[in-house]
C-alpha cells in the first residue's frame, strides 16, 4: 500500500469536494534556482486559488508521497540539492528506499490519479526528442497520457522536442490533443508551430465534458490540453528556431545524452535569449494553472 500525505489545504478541499489541481515539482528542483523557484511555485499556487480551485504540488519526501506541500516543505524542496527526478520508472523505488524526489509529468499523473485529482497543470510535456530515430529518446509522459485518466494542461510539448513526431506518437496512442482557443498547435514559448490543432475546444466547460465522456466510455488514458502562451509573453518561433538548432548542435558535439540533454538545452536557450525563455516559461505555467483551475471547477459541477 502507498501511503499518501495530504497537505492541510488539500485535505480540506478533498473532504469538502472542492476542485483540486495537481502541480509537478520538477519545476522547483530542476527548473530554476532558489529562491526564484519557490517564489514561482508559490505564485502558481496562488493563481489556482484565485481562479477558484485548490493547488496540490506533488513530491516525494523521505519516502512518502505528498499531495500538496506545506510552505516549509516547499522551502525545503526548493533549497535541496541532488533531488531525484522521478518518472514512472523511478517513483516506486524512491518510495521504497525512503528517498526524496520531484515528480515529472508522468509521475505527477500517477500520483494525482491515486489521490483522486483529475486535472494537472504543467509547463510543457516531454515527448519525442530530435534524433530519436537513432537515440530512441522518447519521454514516458506520452505513454502515461495513454493510460492514466488525468487531463493535463500544458503549453504543448517543449519546443526543444520533435513536435511532429511527438504528435504522431500521441495519435498512435489514442491521446486526445486538444488545443485551447486556436487552430494551430502551440510550441511552448511560441504560440505558433507548423502543425494544425488535432482538436480545438474553446471553453473549460467543454474540456471538462470531454474528460467526463472519456471516462463514461471506459476509454483508458487522459487528454492533453495545449494552451497557447499569452501573446504578450511569447517568443516568436522565427527567433527561437535558430537558437534551438544551435543548442542542439552543441549538445551533439559535446556528446550529451539521456536526462542531461534537456537541462543543457534549456540553459543554452536561456543564455541566448538573455533570460527571456525563463520569463516566458513562468508566464505560460501561470496561464496553464488558471485554465486548469477553470477545468477542475467545471468538472466538479458536472459530477456534483
Predicted regions: what they are:
Residues 104, 133-171, 205-209:
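Active-site glycine-rich loop that binds ribose-phosphate moieties when present
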Residues 21-23, 56-60, 101, 119-124, ...:
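General beta-strand structural signal in soluble alpha/beta enzymes
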Residues 216-287:
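A C-terminal functional module that forms or caps the active site or interfaces directly
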Residues 25, 30-32, 38-95, 216-232:
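Glycine-rich nucleotide/cofactor/substrate-binding loop typically near the N-terminus or early
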Residues 12-15, 20-21, 110-114, 119-121, ...:
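Solvent-exposed alpha-helices and their adjacent loops that cap or buttress functional pockets
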Residues 190-216:
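Anionic-ligand binding region
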Residues 1-50, 114:
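N-terminal glycine-/serine-/threonine-rich phosphate-binding loop
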Residues 35-41, 73-78, 127-146, 169:
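A glycine- and small-aliphatic-rich helix-loop capping segment at beta-alpha/alpha-beta transitions
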Amino acid at each position: 500500500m502507498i501511503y499518501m500525505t495530504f497537505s492541510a489545504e488539500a485535505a480540506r478541499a478533498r473532504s469538502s469536494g472542492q476542485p483540486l489541481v495537481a502541480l509537478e515539482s520538477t519545476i522547483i528542483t530542476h527548473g530554476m534556482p532558489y529562491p526564484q523557484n519557490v517564489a514561482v511555485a508559490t505564485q502558481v499556487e496562488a493563481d489556482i486559488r484565485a481562479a477558484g480551485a485548490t493547488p496540490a504540488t506533488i513530491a516525494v519526501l523521505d519516502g512518502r508521497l505528498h499531495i500538496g506541500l506545506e510552505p516549509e516543505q516547499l522551502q525545503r524542496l526548493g533549497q535541496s540539492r541532488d533531488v531525484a527526478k522521478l518518472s514512472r520508472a523511478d517513483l516506486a523505488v524512491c518510495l521504497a528506499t525512503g528517498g526524496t524526489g520531484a515528480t515529472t509529468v508522468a509521475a505527477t499523473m500517477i500520483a494525482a490519479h491515486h489521490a483522486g485529482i483529475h486535472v494537472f497543470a504543467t509547463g510543457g510535456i516531454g515527448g519525442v526528442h530530435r534524433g530519436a530515430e537513432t537515440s530512441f529518446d522518447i519521454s514516458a509522459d506520452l505513454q502515461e497520457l495513454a493510460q492514466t485518466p488525468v487531463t493535463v494542461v500544458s503549453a504543448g510539448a517543449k519546443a526543444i522536442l520533435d513536435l511532429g513526431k511527438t504528435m504522431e506518437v500521441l495519435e498512435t496512442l489514442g491521446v486526445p490533443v486538444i488545443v485551447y482557443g486556436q487552430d494551430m498547435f502551440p510550441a511552448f514559448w511560441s504560440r505558433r508551430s507548423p502543425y494544425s490543432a488535432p482538436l480545438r475546444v474553446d471553453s473549460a466547460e467543454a474540456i471538462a465534458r470531454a474528460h467526463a465522456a472519456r471516462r463514461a466510455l471506459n476509454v483508458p488514458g487522459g487528454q492533453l490540453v495545449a494552451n497557447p502562451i499569452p501573446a504578450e509573453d511569447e517568443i516568436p518561433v522565427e527567433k527561437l528556431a535558430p537558437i534551438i538548432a544551435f543548442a542542439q548542435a552543441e549538445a551533439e558535439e559535446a556528446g550529451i545524452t539521456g536526462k542531461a540533454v534537456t537541462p543543457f538545452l534549456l540553459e543554452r536557450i536561456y543564455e541566448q535569449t538573455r533570460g527571456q525563455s525563463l520569463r516566458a516559461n513562468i508566464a505560460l505555467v501561470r496561464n496553464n494553472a488558471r485554465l486548469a483551475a477553470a477545468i477542475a471547477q467545471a468538472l466538479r459541477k458536472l459530477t456534483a
